[in-house]
């Protein structure tokens, strides 16, 4: 059936009847720090009536029976079935929190842990932080004596294992949204399997909207016989609340999905009935571009006398909360909402009224290239699971339609699921955590999806260069153990621990805290030039790190005033969080007796301290007009958001991360002196024979691969 779209032509496979019924599933986010808001269709009922309306309620006793009789229960439950909020409460009601025991529930994202904890506390009539609490990075809202249901990120669960390796206070651990397969989800999965062998009483629930249940069952099942009666793991499926969704594909590919998204929205508005539109794109820049184009289209349609108007709204993680909330505001019957979103709308929010979904077919993910040692954000095709999840957004409240901006043949060639983070990430933080947990032979660790060997070697080399590992790949004392205690990238941890030696711990604390917060600068589409002009007041020629320091110090000087932030187009909540993060990091520096010192306005000690942690992320300006990495001569460019963009390019820079769009762009960039690299990382860099050249000297890093096996020696020196 041809879809009502002009230049973009769709067709729906199959019959003229209802399309594919899509059940939503949750997918890992690249931009996931936004506010979670969940639409509740039963809000008018009492709390108890709402609980009983959820599909999982009918299976309450069966779930408790399975948990009593199996070490591991894999629960596949569609979005909205109630598994995240209800199962922990069923466990508490059945006695699993008696005698001081705790039910722990992990979430892959901080915002989900906080939101679900708040909902469960509300349902139980409890004060959040007492019986029900949450623990996320830099924010522990629990009571050691009173908390019985604890929501936490998977990363925080792994950190708890550093103090209590067998998780002795927990009776049940529930891994929610396990299919997202984040780095720390996979670490937790491997560690929990080891713990279960020591603790037969520990119960594990692996829950998700959609996952490869058989793979999880095979991984956790400790039955070594052919007798199914001796299985230790079982699968349970819970139904949900979804409506049929008709799927439409393109008849032929289009070269520009941004333009096609705009055309599709306009045609739906002109030819389809009531219902709001949700369009998926890959990032903030694309979202803002499409929003601007659609606003122009809406004005043009209004001039033609069209009675129904379009209200176009952006939705992405870095959008201020008050802007995000606009997508939930009711509109009159003469207005149709169009929400243009990143994949934050796949999982972190649920919006009522969506009937039409437009899927561009791409997503922005973090990927690590072990050959270049660069981790960056890249735009890649979505998985089939993610595409189905997007389509399901149109079937929440009634039957819907999904327009995919790609062919059915292209859909069939998409991967079934997204590659786990473990296989596409920088593994230095992972290895550091495993080493701190006593896992000496990380290459023999039971990963559910083993990471590439080259990525492991690259991570070991970096940790060795930072001084966190010795030549035998053991954690160094005290530096390695201290780096492992920081809930940060090892480079940030090293920078913080060295800050006292450089006499600038006060400044480095502020910089490190600010670098943990995304989108500090707010640029409203209708005030772009004004916002950029105001932001330039904070900029310094040294680069982004000191610019962020200026922003933070100005925020503190103005008593953390929200009005001041609004006037200066700054993310108030982000800055408040940066202040909280700074206090947490400060406690660690006090613990490790790092001297409290300030550089008193001198930038050099601060810059040198940054280099002491980020020396591996160095690049030099090339005659071609681009930058080249010192390590592998990879071409990089300064990101347009950097204060150094469009300025006279510094000869040498260091950066925090790289993102890939049309080019590889460095973000959070600061100018440095090449001599600092030789001075602060002589083990990593050596002076070349020609002027202004450096060698990358890789130390001898030995990796024990097998118990009785061999040693792989890395001893390379590359002249650039």
Swiss-Prot record:
Domain Helicase C-terminal: 261-438
Cellular component GO terms held in the UniProt record: catalytic step 2 spliceosome
Binding positions for ATP per the UniProt entry: 77-84
Keywords: ATP-binding, Helicase, Hydrolase, mRNA processing, mRNA splicing, Nucleotide-binding, Spliceosome
GO BP: in utero embryonic development; mRNA processing; RNA splicing
GO MF: ATP binding; ATP hydrolysis activity; RNA binding; RNA helicase activity
EC number assigned by the record: 3.6.4.13
Reactions the enzyme catalyzes: ATP + H2O = ADP + phosphate + H(+)
SMART domains: DEXDc, HA2, HELICc
Broad enzyme group: hydrolase
Keyword Cytoplasm: no
Pfam families, per database record: HA2_C, HA2_N, Helicase_C, OB_NTP_bind
Presence of keyword Transcription: no
Residue stretches spanning the membrane: none
Motif (DEAH box): 176-179
Sequence ranges assigned to domain Helicase ATP-binding in this UniProt record: 64-229
Gene3D superfamilies named among the record's database cross-references: 1.20.120.1080, P-loop containing nucleotide triphosphate hydrolases
Family: Belongs to the DEAD box helicase family. DEAH subfamily.
Record's subunit section: Identified in the spliceosome C complex.
Function field: May be involved in pre-mRNA splicing.
Official protein name in the record: Probable ATP-dependent RNA helicase DHX35
Species of the source: Pongo abelii
Name of the coding gene: DHX35
């Amino acid at each position: 059936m041809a879809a009502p779209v002009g230049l973009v032509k769709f067709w729906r496979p199959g019959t003229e009847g209802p399309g594919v019924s899509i059940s939503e599933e949750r997918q890992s986010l690249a931009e996931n720090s936004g506010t979670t808001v969940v639409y509740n269709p039963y809000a008018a009922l009492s709390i108890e009536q709402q609980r009983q309306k959820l599909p999982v309620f009918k299976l309450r006793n069966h779930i408790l029976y399975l948990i009593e009789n199996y070490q591991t229960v894999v629960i596949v439950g569609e979005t909205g079935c109630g598994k995240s909020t209800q199962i922990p409460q069923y466990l508490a009601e059945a006695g699993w929190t008696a005698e001081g025991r705790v039910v722990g529930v992990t979430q892959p994202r901080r915002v989900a842990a906080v939101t679900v904890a708040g909902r469960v506390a509300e349902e139980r009539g409890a004060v959040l932080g007492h019986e029900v609490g949450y623990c996320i990075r830099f924010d522990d809202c629990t009571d050691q004596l009173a908390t019985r249901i604890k929501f936490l990120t998977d990363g925080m669960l792994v950190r708890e294992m550093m103090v209590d390796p067998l998780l002795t206070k927990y009776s049940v651990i529930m891994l929610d949204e396990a299919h997202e397969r984040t780095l720390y989800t996979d670490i937790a999965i491997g560690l929990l399997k080891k713990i279960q062998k020591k603790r037969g009483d520990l119960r594990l629930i692996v829950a998700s909207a959609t996952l490869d249940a058989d793979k999880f069952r095979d991984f956790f099942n400790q039955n070594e016989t052919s007798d199914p009666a001796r299985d230790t793991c079982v699968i349970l499926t819970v139904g949900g609340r979804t409506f049929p969704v008709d799927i439409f594909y393109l008849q032929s590919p289009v070269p520009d999905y941004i333009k096609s998204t705009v055309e599709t929205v306009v045609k739906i508005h002109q030819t389809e009935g009531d219902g709001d539109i949700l369009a998926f794109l890959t990032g903030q820049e694309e979202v803002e571009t499409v929003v601007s184009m659609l606003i122009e289209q809406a004005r043009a349609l209004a001039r033609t006398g069209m009675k129904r108007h379009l209200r176009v709204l952006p939705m992405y993680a870095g959008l201020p909360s008050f802007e995000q909330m606009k997508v939930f505001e009711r509109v009159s019957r003469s207005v149709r909402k169009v929400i243009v979103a990143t994949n934050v709308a796949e999982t972190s929010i649920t919006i009522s009224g969506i009937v039409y979904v437009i899927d561009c077919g791409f997503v922005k993910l973090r990927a690590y290239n072990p050959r270049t040692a660069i981790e960056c954000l890249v735009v890649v095709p979505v998985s089939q699971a993610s595409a189905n999840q997007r389509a399901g957004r149109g079937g929440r409240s009634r039957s819907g339609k999904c327009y995919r901006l790609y062919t059915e043949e292209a859909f069939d060639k998409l991967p079934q699921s997204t590659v786990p983070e473990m296989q596409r990430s920088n593994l230095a933080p992972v290895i550091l955590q495993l080493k701190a947990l006593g896992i000496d032979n990380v290459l023999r660790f039971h990963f559910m999806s083993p990471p590439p060997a080259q990525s492991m070697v690259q991570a070991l080399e970096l940790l060795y260069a930072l001084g966190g590992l010795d030549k035998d790949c053991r954690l160094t004392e005290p530096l390695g153990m201290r780096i492992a205690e920081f809930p940060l990238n090892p480079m940030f941890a090293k920078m913080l621990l060295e800050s006292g030696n450089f006499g600038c711990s006060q400044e480095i604390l502020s910089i490190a805290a600010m670098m943990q917060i995304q989108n500090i600068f707010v640029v409203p589409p209708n005030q772009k030039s004004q916002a950029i002009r105001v932001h330039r007041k904070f900029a310094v020629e040294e680069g982004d790190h000191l610019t962020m320091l200026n922003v933070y110090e100005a925020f503190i000087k103005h008593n953390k005033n929200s009005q001041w932030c609004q006037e200066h187009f700054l993310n108030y909540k982000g800055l408040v969080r940066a202040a909280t993060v700074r206090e947490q990091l400060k406690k660690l520096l006090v613990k490790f007796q790092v001297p409290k010192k300030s550089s008193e306005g001198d930038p050099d000690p601060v810059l040198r301290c940054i280099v002491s942690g980020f020396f591996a992320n160095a690049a030099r300006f090339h005659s071609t007009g681009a930058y080249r990495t010192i390590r592998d001569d990879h071409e990089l460019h300064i990101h347009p958001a950097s204060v150094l963009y469009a300025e006279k390019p510094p000869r040498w820079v260091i950066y925090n991360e790289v993102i890939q769009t049309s080019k590889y762009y460095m973000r959070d960039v600061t100018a440095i002196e090449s001599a600092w690299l030789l001075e602060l990382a002589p083990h990593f860099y050596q002076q070349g024979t020609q002027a202004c050249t450096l060698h990358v000297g890789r130390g001898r890093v030995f990796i024990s691969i097998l118990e009785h096996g061999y040693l792989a020696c890395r001893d390379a020196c590359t002249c650039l």
